[in-house]
Design a protein with these regions (language model features):
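Glycine-rich hexapeptide-repeat left-handed beta-helix
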Residues: 150, 155-230
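A general structural motif
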Residues: 5, 32, 64-66, 93, ...
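Short glycine-rich anion-binding loops that position phosphate/pyrophosphate groups of nucleotides
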Residues: 16, 74-78, 213
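Phosphate-bearing ligand-interacting subdomains
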Residues: 41-101, 105
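Alpha-helical elements of the RecA-like P-loop NTPase motor core of helicases
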Residues: 18, 22, 80-83, 198, ...
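A solvent-exposed beta-alpha-beta segment
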Residues: 2-68
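Left-handed beta-helix
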Residues: 76-84, 88-146, 157-160, 164, ...
Length: 230
């Protein structure tokens, strides 16, 4: 286990926050010292023996000049909750930690933004660009020179071929695949096992099947959010 010489506050106290705590504790030099959630959602005082403090007051006990943070929220409301808390914490002056599991393969000239979480056994090829606030679960392939924009969420087993572009706040489900040079517009949901063989130009679509076809409901209807975002 690595020596813990940096302090981290996790934003969130749900299942993903618990998972993030395990990974940071086991595979990083960050010591998790507290969890924080918005006052309205606090239903207990501790998690793993650590305090859960109101997000609205986090800087009182954990000032941004001494502590970094990570927003451990999944794809709730089409990734908008994670995006909102990320922006609010940034406005408070916090800097963010990106976690990359030691088993991840990173090709040359890969660029990864802040507040990202990349689980084990991902293959990220040369010149891939990953934006801020992106969650990538285990065992995905991201092909050379592909771009994943801010606030996206990739489940496990996703295959993204080379030169693809994934728009902001999109969700890619388990075992979906994209042909090379595919462009996906923002706020898109790609369902489990879907095979995308052509560009998705209109934002807010939900796609399933092989080849992927659009469903009548939009992603905004599925998640109950507005198209313009936060």
């Amino acid at each position: 286990m690595k020596e813990k010489n940096k302090k981290l506050v996790i934003i969130g106290a749900g299942e993903f926050a618990e998972i993030a705590y395990e990974y940071f504790s086991g595979f990083s030099d960050y010591e998790v010292v507290a969890f924080t959630v918005e006052k309205a959602f606090i239903n207990k005082s501790e998690l793993f023996g650590l305090p859960i403090v109101p997000f609205e007051e986090i800087e009182k006990d954990y000032p941004p000049d001494k502590y970094k943070t990570f927003v451990a929220i999944t794809y709730t409301q089409l990734n908008r909750v994670r995006e909102r808390l990320y922006k609010q914490a940034k406005k408070k002056g916090y800097k963010f930690v990106t976690f990359i599991h030691p088993t991840v393969f990173l090709g040359r000239d890969v660029k990864i933004g802040e507040n990202c979480f990349i689980f084990e056994y991902n293959n990220i090829q040369r010149k891939v660009k990953i934006g801020n606030n992106v969650i990538i679960w285990a065992k995905n392939h991201i092909g050379h020179q592909s771009i994943i924009k801010d606030n996206c969420y990739l489940a496990s087993g996703v295959i993204i071929s080379g030169y693809c572009k994934i728009g902001e706040n999109s969700f890619l489900g388990v075992n979906c695949s994209l042909n090379d040079k595919i462009k996906i517009s923002k706020d898109t949901i790609i369902g489990n096992g879907a095979i995308v063989i052509k560009d998705i130009e209109e934002p807010g679509g939900v796609y399933v099947g092989n080849p992927a076809r659009r469903l009548p409901k939009s992603s905004y209807e599925v998640f109950g959010v507005k198209e313009e975002g936060i």
